Amino acid sequence: EVNFPMNENLEIEYKMLVSEQEFNQLRDLTGVDQVLVQSNVYYDCTPSSTLKHIAMRIRDVQGKHWFTMKIPQAEGVREMEMELPENSPEALDNPEIRALFDELGLTLPVHVCGQMITHRHLRVYPLGELCLDHSLINGRSDYEIEFEITGDPQAGKAFFLDLLNQAGLTYRENKRSKYARCVLDQ
């Protein structure tokens, strides 16, 4: 059996739902370093992890399968992530994920509760990663801009707001995650 260690980080990001026109404005202004096609399968358990505002998925990108669990914190989101050998409910039944489930009071097994495909236009900056996401969620197009801060949080936010300003956009906080739009808004 292959051992895939779990990574933990505190995700601080700014997200905004946009129209297709706004998406194109920012993409044309910033350019992109690469475009990734991501297949996301969202999972839940009984009782539901959404009652604790926890989201979990396995994302297939570039031939790899990444398990991610997002747990809200006072500031940011605790993100637990590890590579898996496959995208299936059975792949989640391993010691590290069972320990995480125990810590959070969740139980296996899990079941699929939603799926989506995202075309991520990625641009890396010194203060963070700009992700321009066009997703197909339950048969409809969804456009979202994310700036995931990798440096100083205040400088990263200022940089992102300046990018939006250059594109003629004003920041509108997005309170609905992709998980919520895919799973809860069906």
Name each model feature, range by range.
Residues 58-62, 134-136, 149:
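Short, low-complexity Ser/Thr-rich regulatory SLiMs
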Residues 3-126, 178-186:
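N-terminal strand-loop-strand beta-hairpin
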Residues 123-135:
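Short amphipathic beta-strand starts and helix->beta connectors
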Residues 24, 132, 155-156:
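Short helix/loop capping segments that flank catalytic or ligand/cofactor-binding pockets
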Residues 150-186:
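Acidic/polar low-complexity flexible segments
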